[in-house]
A protein has these predicted regions:
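Catalytic-core segments of hydrolase enzymes
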Residues: 1-56, 99-101
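Short intrinsically disordered coil segments
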Residues: 33-36, 61-63, 68, 131
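Substrate-binding/active-site groove segments that recognize
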Residues: 44, 117-118
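Secreted peptidase-domain scaffold signal
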Residues: 121-131
Length: 131
C-alpha cells in the first residue's frame, strides 16, 4: 500500500454513502482513505468495523482480515433494513438518517465523517414520522 490516503473515485461521488473502516478501538484504520473531496465535501460519510473483521477464506476457514470492503457490507445491510422498514423514504432521506445516527454527527470531519452509525437510533428516527 502506498502513502496516498485521500478519498478518490468512486468514493468521492455526490449522492453516495462512502464508508471508511475503523479498528476495534474505533480509530480510523491505517488503510482507510480520508477526505475532503476535491471540492471540499466531507468524506468518508460513516465508518464501520473493518480492521480486523472475521471473514470466510477461499478454503472455508474463518480468518481475520482488513479492509473497507468488509466495512461497507455492514452499512449496506443497515441501509437495506432501514429502507425495508420505510419504503416510502427516498435514498437521500435514508442516507441522511444514517449519517445523523453517527457518533460524530455533531461535528463531522474528514477522518471519521459522521462516525459509526447507530442502527437503533437510525431506525427510530426513520420510523418516527413514517406513516
Amino acid at each position: 500500500m502506498g502513502t496516498w490516503k485521500k478519498i478518490n473515485v468512486p468514493a468521492d461521488a455526490h449522492d453516495i454513502l462512502t464508508v471508511g473502516a475503523v479498528s476495534l478501538d474505533k480509530v480510523n484504520a491505517p488503510f482507510s482513505s480520508i477526505g475532503p473531496t476535491a471540492d471540499g465535501r466531507i468524506k468518508p460519510d460513516v465508518m464501520a468495523y473493518g480492521c480486523p473483521t472475521n471473514v470466510v477464506s477461499g478454503r472455508g476457514y474463518i480468518i481475520p482480515d482488513n479492509g473497507t470492503s468488509f466495512a461497507c457490507p455492514l452499512i449496506a445491510g443497515m441501509v437495506a433494513c432501514l429502507w425495508q422498514a420505510c419504503p416510502n423514504k427516498s435514498a437521500k432521506e435514508i442516507l441522511d438518517i444514517v449519517r445523523q445516527s453517527g457518533n460524530n454527527c455533531q461535528s463531522p470531519d474528514n477522518i471519521m465523517g459522521y462516525g459509526i452509525p447507530d442502527f437503533w437510533s437510525a431506525y427510530q428516527s426513520a420510523t418516527r414520522y413514517n406513516q
